[in-house]
Amino acid sequence: MMPVTLSGAFYYPQCPTTFVWKNVDESIEKKNEWNEGQVYANGNRIIFWLNGYTLGDETLDPKVHRISKSGNIGIQVHGGDQFKGMQVAFQNIDILKIKPGDPPSMPVVVVCKELVPLP
């Protein structure tokens, strides 16, 4: 099942349903405006906020999922026939270095996650 909106979805092709979490509340995404996303990635824990709402909080099993201590960060959009005319732009990207165990800087109250079992 596709998410209501792809903004903030955790896309993971190895997951049986393709998405670890999905944004199921369309009102969180601002259409044709700037949206603010925040990612917390510390060790094997990943949290994502969209416009102040926690969309997902997942701790990946390090026995199954490779955790890199260094490398590149990718920001992407997937195109396709269903997304003709879609435009994506990014501004004010800040990357902050944190230490293992540092807590997230925002409250974690998941409002949109649909639980999806990881492989």
Model-derived features: positions:
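Carbohydrate-interacting regions of secretory-pathway proteins
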Residues: 1-119
